[in-house]
Each structure stands twice: as structure tokens, then as C-alpha cells.
Amino acid sequence: MFKLKYLQIAITIYVVLILALILFQRFILLHPKKLAKDYHFDFPKSEEFYVQITSDIKINALRFSTTDSVSKGAVLYFHGNADNLARWGEHATQFTERGYDVVMYDYRGFGKSNGRFDEKNFLNDAQYIFDDLSRRYNPDKIILYGRSLGCGAAIKVASENPVKKLILETPYYSLPEVVWSHLPIFPFKYVSEFKVPAHQWLPKVHCDIHVFHGTDDEVVPYNQSIKLLTTTNRNPDKTLTTLQGGHHRDLEKFKEYQAKMDELLK
């Protein structure tokens, strides 16, 4: 009887935890920070603008100009799952100093962008932003750069459009796979609101692909990149820079990262 009672308690706790995981998955995966509409971005050689997605949805974006006299093209940067452009804009210099203009934007519900984040809008907005950028640059001059969460959007856009190159920093096989790697006793992959199946899109990418990942990434495990890259062998070139001891947020500090970026953006 006692064993049965404890089993019932354990099952009840497990079910409650699963329900909590389902109900609060948005707060687990997304950590946006809003910005006041009059917030001023203070980045050099940058311009703030909005992209009107629908009559009531406006996406806030930043355009950075290269420090070189002539631009090599543009980098469309898809940022991670937290904060806003006030943080992510700091990463633009690694591209502008190497001769590229940069466009980055906040997802719905992040920064000054209005609306509610969901998977469909996340992917559709990425294509819309790419289309907007394509009016200013030929697609063969556009590099897509995905960072963590943003890797899914970058891969999806690259799978449907001709671009110069796809660069991924700490990518994932799918979002449920990432959560599963941390909580393997929970069936999150079957109940997740967010799927973002990057592994289904990567085989359709025909441009060069390069991946950066640290071996000590505590958010998106290193093996996510290994597993993702095994899904494709169709593209002209796919390479992986493994950063020994690299975590989720510190890859830019590695000389191997900087050397590879010099090569990729030459």
C-alpha cells in the first residue's frame, strides 16, 4: 500500500511538472526585453528603421554601414532568444570592420517590435525582412548569420533563397531536441509549442555553410551541431569550427573564431 501511495504521488508530481513545462514553455525559451518607443540606439554608423509586416505589425531594425569605403555586401543577422537590439547591435562591428553592411532586427515582442512571438511569425517575418533587404542588395551579396535561436530562421531563409553564405553560431537540430537534452525525462518534443525543425531545412540549403560551436556550451549542447550537419551533404561546402572550452556566449573571444571569420568574410 505504501509503495502504491508513493507511486501515485510520484506520478502526480510528474504530471504536474509536465503541465507546468507546457504552460510555461514560452517563458523558458524566450527572454525578450521591451524598449520604449523613444529609446535611442547609440551605435556608430547605424540607422534605425521599421519594416511594416502587416497593417498593425511593425518590426524594429537597425542598419549598420561598413567602415570600408566600398561595401562587399550585407549580413542579415538573426539574433538569439533574449534581450533586444540594444544588446545585439554590439555584434555588428565584427562585420562592418570586415567590409560588410549589417541589418539586424528584433522579433515580435522584443525591443520596439510589437506583436506576439510564435513560430509561424518568426519564420515568415525572417523571409519578409530578407525580401526587404534583397531590394537593396543582390542575394548573391547577402550572408545570413544565425545566432542560437536565430539559426532556425537563418536556415529556413537559406533553404528557400539563393544567398552567398550561411553562418551559424551555436545552432540546433530542433528546439524540442535542445530542451530534451536538458530534461530527458519529459516528453517535451511531443508537446512543444515551438518546433523550428532546422534539420528538415538544412538539406535544402545550397550555399556554403559554416558552423561555430563551443564544446562546453551549457545552453545548446555541442552535439546539436554535429547532429544537424549530418543531415546534409548537398551543399558545396560545409565546415565546423569547434572551439574547445567555448560556452554559449563567448565564442567571439576565441582567436580561432576571429581567424575563421576573417576567412569567411574576406
Please state what every model-predicted region is.
Residues 3-53:
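An N-terminal hydrophobic leader/cap segment in hydrolases
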Residues 54-132, 152:
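Membrane-embedded segments
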Residues 91, 198, 207, 221-230:
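Short alpha-helix in the alpha/beta-hydrolase fold that links the catalytic acid
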Residues 132-135, 139-183:
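Primarily recognizes the serine-hydrolase "nucleophile elbow" in alpha/beta-hydrolase
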Residues 187-201, 206-207:
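Active-site nucleophile elbow and catalytic-triad environment of alpha/beta-hydrolase enzymes
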Residues 205, 211-213, 217:
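Short beta-strand/loop motif that positions the catalytic acidic residue
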Residues 216-220, 248-249:
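Acidic catalytic loop of the alpha/beta-hydrolase fold
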Residues 227, 234-266:
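C-terminal catalytic histidine-bearing segment of alpha/beta-hydrolase fold enzymes
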